Amino acid sequence: MLAFHFTTLQKAESEYNYFIVNNLKNLRKVFNIENLKWELLEDESENQSGNIYWFNLSYDHSSGEGSYLYRMEPNTKSKAHHHTGPEEFFILEGDLTDSDGYLYKKGDFVQLSSGSSHYSTTKNGCTSVVTHRGKYIYSEE
């Protein structure tokens, strides 16, 4: 009886794996940074010389969770904001200076804990991948 049950489980697992592999194309999204239609992030771009753009990968405004691409033009400053959950970002190109003066550069992966507050500036422009696990709230600097 145990051998029959084990064989049945193996068969079910095999069928599941076959389904996943053969349906992977229906479960996959691919974005190439060279071919994106960036959107102006108006809340961040108002009242400053440089603009900030984003491309939503999976960010959900209602939960504050997910990922997006974030691009700042040279000599731009983001608005100050507070994080209700952790934020992580990976610098793909350019430079980014946090409000405490810490300079991030291409290749840096940054983790900010829940409860952090900051704004960022860039001298040469910056493109990053950002992931939030909680909402961010604009604040006074």
Task: Set out the residue ranges of the language-model regions.
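Short acidic-glycine-tyrosine-enriched beta hairpin
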Residues: D98-S117
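Long, charge-rich low-complexity segments
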Residues: F31-K37, R133-E141
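Glycine- and acidic-residue-biased ligand/ion/polar-headgroup-sensing regions
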Residues: P74, H83-S99
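Ligand-binding loop in jelly-roll beta-barrel domains
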Residues: S114-Y138
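Conserved short histidine dyad/triad with adjacent acidic residue
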Residues: Y53-H83, S114
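A short, N-terminal "cap"/entry segment at the start of jelly-roll beta-barrel domains
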Residues: L2-S63
